[in-house]
Amino acid sequence: MTDLTAAARLALSLMDLTTLNDDDTDEKVTKLCHQAKSPEGNTAAICIYPRFIPLARKVLREQGTPEIRIATVTNFPHGNDDLDIALAETNAALAYGADEVDVVFPYRALMAGNEQIGFDIVKACKDACAKAGALLKVIIETGELKDPALIRKASEISIKAGADFIKTSTGKVPVNATLESAELMLQVIHDMGVGKEVGFKPAGGVRTAEEAAQYLALANRIMGDNWVDARHFRFGASSLLGNLLATLGHGEQKSSSGY
């Protein structure tokens, strides 16, 4: 097995296979569930809008993969600074049955100098998720923050407020995951000494096995060789799956979007 096939197999098992499009339908979400059960094993999770969770739960159960986790998004994709709305959306997502909630950090408020609202929103959503036994991932939108100091600050605030994962991007802005932002975020996890509790998720723009391998190598370098697993590392992606399967000898499979 080459290093690339090993990385491809690992990356597949760490994927949050995603469809977050305005034209999503029951049919598209059902297809996504089928894709998550791949010939090389299951993805870690699927990531879909909250209203599709009951359907996805049923499809995953019927196809014999109830262990595939269901993630969803809240305060998405805008990252507004209204705590009541962010919390209400998170509670609704949990009521639908989400295993994991990816909430967007109020990054524009942080850029304007308000650190407190980010902490408050993450903490409120974390408390709700903890009660429901769900994981909370916090999307800091690195491609909009841009400034390394702000990327670090958003990561630190999210972790202090209880984030289970910090995630780069919504996939809805021009610049999504980059190795540079990944390095900054992983370094914060390392420097705060929270590697046991906090994971990392690059999202958007990771489209090939080669790119995935670069992120895995970066995580190994910063966090150590045994850190990467589904509790500590995810890829938020859709088009990546087809490339991983092609790398593993299954031919090119098209996915539902370019995320």
UniProtKB/Swiss-Prot annotation:
The active site is at 102 (proton donor/acceptor), 167 (schiff-base intermediate with acetaldehyde), 201 (proton donor/acceptor). The lineage of its organism: Bacteria, Pseudomonadati, Pseudomonadota, Gammaproteobacteria, Enterobacterales. Catalyzes a reversible aldol reaction between acetaldehyde and D-glyceraldehyde 3-phosphate to generate 2-deoxy-D-ribose 5-phosphate. Its main location: cytoplasm. GO terms for molecular function: deoxyribose-phosphate aldolase activity. One of its GO terms (cellular component) is cytoplasm. This is Deoxyribose-phosphate aldolase. CDD domains: DeoC (cd00959). Pathway: Carbohydrate degradation; 2-deoxy-D-ribose 1-phosphate degradation; D-glyceraldehyde 3-phosphate and acetaldehyde from 2-deoxy-alpha-D-ribose 1-phosphate: step 2/2. NCBIfam families: deoC (TIGR00126). Pfam families: DeoC. HAMAP family: DeoC_type2. It is found in: Cytoplasm. Its EC number is 4.1.2.4. One of its GO terms (biological process) is carbohydrate catabolic process. Belongs to the DeoC/FbaB aldolase family. DeoC type 2 subfamily. It comes from the Bacteria. Coiled coil: none annotated.
